A protein has these predicted regions:
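Intrinsically disordered, low-complexity, charge-rich terminal extensions
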Residues: 1-172
């Protein structure tokens, strides 16, 4: 039985996405704008935080380096990138206006392992009992909207051979 052909492609795209996201965060302050918008309210920022894992090689020759530290320059991870490794897992921060989300993303499955939403307003007596839950769902939906928009931007670059070749040269 052969594995699904897309398995390797999914892993590759996930690693390329996180590596590209790190690069974008370093070179453009991680600034993104919703597609088709010129409104300043539609700007958001995405950065990889001080905890990530880089992986390179295949099978028995697979090497992984995990790096974390507050305000760390991530030198080991940078050395891994220059050796051809790619980001495999990362803590990603999304900021839009006053709101701040954090998620841990696994590149192999593009699975969100953890999601921290912005703080919710305090529930006061007389408030709708469902308000707290609905606000939390709204914040989760906003996180997914930001993630989807970021991934869409990546795919626009990745699916253009000319744009992707230029981006890879810049990343290396």
């Amino acid at each position: 039985m052969t594995s699904y052909l897309g398995d390797n492609l999914d892993i590759l795209l996930g690693r390329e996405f996180l590596t590209w996201l790190w690069y974008r965060g370093e070179t453009s302050s991680g600034m993104f704008r919703f597609s088709g918008s010129k409104n300043d309210d539609d700007v958001f920022f995405v950065t990889l935080e001080q905890r990530l894992t880089v992986t390179g090689g295949e099978g028995d020759h697979k090497e992984t380096a995990s790096v974390s530290g507050s305000f760390s320059p991530l030198l080991e991870a940078r050395a891994g990138l220059s050796a051809g490794k790619q980001v495999n897992r990362a803590l990603i921060r999304f900021v839009r206006g006053e709101l701040d989300w954090q998620m841990t993303l696994n590149a192999e499955s593009l699975r969100i392992n953890a999601l921290k939403t912005p703080p919710q307003s305090k529930q006061e007596e007389g408030d709708d009992p469902d308000a707290f839950f609905l606000e939390k769902m709204y914040l989760i939906e906003q996180a997914m909207t930001l993630f989807n928009e970021t991934y869409k931007k990546f795919l626009n670059v990745r699916l253009s051979p000319k744009d992707w070749a230029a981006e890879v040269r810049n990343i290396q």
